[in-house]
Amino acid sequence: MKATKTTYKKDPMGLTPSQIVNELNRFIVGQEKAKKAVAIALRNRCRRKRVEGNLRNEIVPKNILMIGSTGVGKTEIARRLAKLTNSPFYKIEATKFTEVGYVGRDVESIMRDLVEIAVNTEKTLAKTKVDINAREKAIERILDSLVGKTSSSETREKFKEKILNGELDDTEIEISVADTTPVGSGSFEIPGMPGASMGVLNLGDMIGRALGSSKTKTKKMLVKDAMAIIIPEESEKLIDQEKIIQQAINLAENDGIVFIDEIDKIASTGSSGAKNAEISREGVQRDLLPLIEGTTVNTKYGPVKTDHILFIASGAFHIAKPSDLLPELQGRLPIRVELNSLTKDDMIKILLEPETSLIKQYSALIGTEDVCLEFAASAIEKIADYAITVNLEVEDIGARRLHTILENLLEDISFEASEMKGKKITIDDKFVENQLSKIITNLDLAKFVL
């Protein structure tokens, strides 16, 4: 049965755990244990906000460790959960970090990036609220350039109507806009730490904002281009930057979700001959401890507490085991969820059931060329069969195998679709076999192609 969007009865605490699972079912097949775990974690956040007194601060999230091979839905569950709640979401691979003092990024950059995401989210939301006013002010500025500030109200009204109707889109005007030319560098890379940068405060910008002024530049441009530049400018003036930053920090602290992938790669396996690597991995784990347990990280927007951020760690754990992580880190990830490897039935459901399934995506893409693309049930079964076979024989990459198989299967159709307007193409099991059987039977070739 296909998952469909449901309208729920209003709950003062947001979605219930069962409703959260139903929402995740719209996009993700199976993995009920993992869905249940994240649904409970999310609901507990809402419950905590309703607890009164000092006890509220003592209630911390129960962080989650997801165990499962690649392509089974670990990242997608976390990402969809964040979208469902409009929470700031940040995904990072644990292998990108090294302990402080070594080459690599320091773990505190997680919080800096999460807050940046929260600020952008809040800023976008604030701009939508002032969009109408910003548009009005932008039109007034363009009218000043078109007909002059001293023109009569009748003239301005007449030209305003033309702007709104798009009649003056290609008219060139000369107008003053904010000078966005960078002076010097806004940030610099920290030596010995690739990918890590430190923001530099621009005193000129700060003083300009404080005095209500900023550098402008007169440019010649079309009316439609001027609108695209001036509306964001006017939006910036209308929104309260300080309030946005406060709201963003609060959003990151109380609703932020951090997904740390490949955590098994920093586990100490105890293998001989890799002592230095073991020390480095253990160092990263020790650096992660205070972040997950709860600490304060300084960002360019101000200090951010990590006490109530939900951390979801994941890994395949093919070589290392969860018990190879530092005992202290294991204690910070109390909820363990094992995700199942995908079966043939799962693959069939993944192809058909989600609202954004691959079959629907490819049909929509080819449909833009006025070509009707349909898949017979026998073809879906054959594709799932081949996906499982290659995963078993080559390497198990889960549902991601379907992407490579479908790309190879539909390569010729995608290439020729623009010359097949008005046609209907039905993919059946014979078509799938003709296109893929040679590759599937030749495992050496399958390793490179699929």
From Swiss-Prot:
Key words, A-Z: ATP-binding, Chaperone, Cytoplasm, Nucleotide-binding, Stress response
GO biological process, one term: protein unfolding
Any GO molecular function: DNA binding
GO cellular component, one term: HslUV protease complex
A Pfam short name: MCM
Binding-site positions, ATP: 29, 71-76, 261, 328, 400
InterPro entries, sorted: AAA+_ATPase, ATP-dep_Clp_protease_ClpX, ATPase_AAA_core, Clp_ATPase_C, HslU, MCM_dom, P-loop_NTPase
Spans traversing the lipid bilayer: none
Annotated function: ATPase subunit of a proteasome-like degradation complex; this subunit has chaperone activity. The binding of ATP and its subsequent hydrolysis by HslU are essential for unfolding of protein substrates subsequently hydrolyzed by HslV. HslU recognizes the N-terminal part of its protein substrates and unfolds these before they are guided to HslV for hydrolysis.
Family: Belongs to the ClpX chaperone family. HslU subfamily.
NCBIfam families referenced in this protein's UniProt entry, alphabetically: hslU, PRK05201.1
Complex and partners: A double ring-shaped homohexamer of HslV is capped on each side by a ring-shaped HslU homohexamer. The assembly of the HslU/HslV complex is dependent on binding of ATP.
The protein's name in its UniProt record: ATP-dependent protease ATPase subunit HslU
Native organism: Rickettsia massiliae (strain Mtu5)
